Regions:
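Acidic carboxylate motifs that coordinate Ca2+ or other divalent cations, activating on Asp/Glu
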Residues: 37
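Bilobed "Venus flytrap"/periplasmic-binding protein-like clamshell domains
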Residues: 19, 23-25, 29, 53-67
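Short helix-initiation/N-cap motifs at beta->coil->alpha
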Residues: 80-90
Length: 181
């Protein structure tokens, strides 16, 4: 979050929204709309992705609908599946999904290494994404072990940038919550 100084404003996502580039990548992988139905296919099979969301965070189905509209622009049939959070958690840990949307407190301790390791660390049971990168793991270890706050901060920033560079996850937004008393 921007309230914790771990590079929020300096991180750069090289995978910005680009419909034409997405279409090029799909075509390069052999996906084209051969039957004119608006959905790209390969070997006669439409590209259909199941996208799991839950309603205990009311903004998540709205994000899912926005993504569904964007995916339609590139010819991908994104089917939204609304399930209980427990199902999302089970799917996320198993890796048995096409896409999941989740809203998680990313730095509830003020130290983001725990969060990054739990979801993307190599060999961690809760890493259902399958992401494994030795450099990422080294950066997390450095961010966890160093006594120097500058070294820890830079390690976390570099780990996050590595995630963005490798399109490990799609970060859609960061909600601002106000508490008024």
């Amino acid at each position: 979050p921007p309230s914790i100084d771990y590079g929020f404003n300096q991180l750069r996502d090289p995978n910005k929204y680009n419909v034409e580039r997405a279409k090029e990548l799909l075509k390069r992988e052999g996906y084209e709309d051969t039957n004119g139905d608006g959905i790209v296919d390969k070997d006669g099979e439409n590209l259909v992705l199941d996208f799991y969301a839950y309603t205990t965070r009311p903004e998540l189905p709205l994000y899912a609908e926005a993504l569904q509209a964007d995916y339609k622009k590139i010819g991908v049939d994104l089917r939204i599946k609304i399930v209980d959070y427990a199902v999302i958690d089970t799917l996320a840990q198993s890796g048995d999904y096409d896409m999941i949307i989740s809203s998680i407190v990313t730095a509830n301790t003020g130290q983001p290494v725990w969060f990054l390791k739990q979801y993307w660390g190599t060999g961690v049971e809760t890493n259902g994404s399958g992401f494994s990168n030795p450099r990422f793991d080294e950066l997390l270890a450095l961010g966890e072990s160093s006594n120097d706050p500058v070294v820890r901060r830079n390690a976390v920033i570099n780990a996050q940038q590595l995630m963005l560079d490798n399109a490990v996850a799609l970060f859609l937004g960061y909600p601002k919550i106000n508490i008024v008393g």
